[in-house]
Swiss-Prot record:
HAMAP family, A to Z: TagBP_aldolase_GatY
Quaternary structure, from the entry: Forms a complex with GatZ.
Binding of dihydroxyacetone phosphate, residues: 181, 209-211, 230-233
Organism of origin: Salmonella choleraesuis (strain SC-B67)
Protein name: D-tagatose-1,6-bisphosphate aldolase subunit GatY
């Protein structure tokens, strides 16, 4: 089996003090980049997609391509549902072969969030599918999800303990000052809050919104209990920036082989950097 649950790899990261990168992908080329780079560096890997990505590319296509790439590189990986909000949607994608999901009920009141997440956990654990959930809200935009900065809420440590106990989740995404998208000013992460959450919660902790974070912040967050680091925007910017630059310089270009190569190379450098920041090279 080359498509696996994220549970074991996150537990190993927790025990050994590194983080597993979760890279958001969109198509064949972005899948190729993250799998090939992770395989070359022997890094554990989570390939993530938002509802919009799976709608665009097709869940069956993503799972099949990821499985074939994983097999060809002899590199097991998790295909992960990022920021999914509906149990019915999750059921359909689990049936298609996904083995790692994030249910996002962070926009609901605390009790309703627990109820939704518990229903997803009860279903997914029957099929050995790992479940991540979010408590607190990150500002910024992810796919079609937009959270105004004033509506962003940090995770409350004591609520985190209750949330994990009542839902049975495998990992918890927390809000400590990161945001989706790029930062207009250097973020100030609440490391004290992270420490307090870690003291109360025994499941692996997840950091969303890591694009553009300084290496020192990622390293410190991992030392305090972060076991999974999500990166999306930074990958898209590198890929699309190189693509636009090539087409600007070669206005008559029409062969995808030519303009996809520099785009993939630019994205690959970001993937390599994130793996280094996570301290997970050679940890597969």
């Amino acid at each position: 089996m080359f498509i696996i649950s994220g549970r074991t790899m996150l537990k190993k990261a927790q025990q050994e003090g590194y983080a597993v990168p979760a890279f958001n992908i969109h198509n064949l080329e972005t899948l190729q980049v993250v799998v090939e780079t992770a395989a070359e560096l022997r890094s554990p890997l989570i390939v993530a997609g938002t509802p919009g990505t799976f709608s665009y590319a097709g869940v069956g296509n993503i799972v099949a391509i990821a499985a074939e790439l994983a097999k060809s590189w002899n590199h097991p990986l998790a295909v992960h549902l990022d920021h999914h909000e509906k149990l019915a949607d999750i059921k359909m994608k689990v049936a298609a072969g996904v083995r790692s999901v994030m249910i996002d009920g962070s926009h609901f009141p605390f009790a309703d969030n627990i109820a939704l997440v518990k229903s997803v956990v009860d279903y997914c654990h029957r099929y050995d599918v790992s479940v991540e959930a979010e408590l607190g809200r990150l500002g910024g935009q992810e796919d079609d999800l937009i959270v105004d900065g004033k509506d962003a809420l940090y995770t409350h440590p004591e609520q985190a303990r209750e949330f994990v106990e009542k839902t049975g989740i495998d990992s918890l995404a927390i809000a400590i000052g990161t945001a989706h998208g790029l930062y207009t000013a250097e973020p100030k992460l609440d490391f004290e809050r992270l420490t307090e959450i870690r003291q109360r919660v025994d499941v692996p902790l997840v950091l969303h919104g890591a694009s553009g974070l300084p290496t020192r912040d990622i390293t410190r967050a991992i030392s305090l209990g972060i076991c999974k680091v999500n990166v999306a925007t930074e990958l898209k910017i590198a890929f699309s920036g190189a693509l636009k630059n090539y087409l600007t310089q070669h206005a008559e270009a029409s062969d995808p082989h030519h303009y996809m190569i520099p785009a993939k190379a630019a994205m690959k450098e970001v993937v390599r950097k994130v793996i280094a920041d996570c301290g997970c090279e050679g940890k597969l």
